[in-house]
């Protein structure tokens, strides 16, 4: 059998780990077998990736099916946990965007060399505070599954977990929005699902709470995009306030 191996000869006149990482990053990208998160794993070894990967080892993520054998093998659970971290760092909803995930892995790799003027307007962080807050929100959702086990199977869908997580984060930074209600959320979730697939151009259905319709539409199609995530948040906020 014949094999082709990429070979790159480099001469380093100085000790530069970042340069070496860039070389291996190019080689890994040319291999065309690694997904984006696996490439990050090969390139970074600082605070952000260490935090995300260590967090992924918690059994809680297996309990709610965020971590499964298939997802873990491709590091998709780590990628999703990275999104939760970014939501926490920015205190706002973000759409699924590989570029901003890459930016966070780079900017928060070495916290001592953080770029205050970064193009993403990402803030400098207190790593201990971020970990503490992450643990608080995780425990809050864990307690919800104990309060009502019906929530647990819903969480295997990343969009549901992200919707709850981002709402909890935002409500703690905005006292004007209604508090999260597990009972109301499960009603919203189940009633929205009962509608089946609703056309995105439908504004309302006769006799149906409009928030059910809005949540249903935002939960379909490209449901990890920013507009859909915000639409689910707005439907939750309106429903909790009723």
Residue ranges and their predicted role:
Residues 1-106, 201-206, 212-226, 230, ...:
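Basic- and aromatic-enriched surface patches that contact anionic nucleotides/nucleic acids
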Residues 93-242:
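C-terminal subdomains that position terminal phosphate/3'-OH groups for nucleotidyl transfer/ligation
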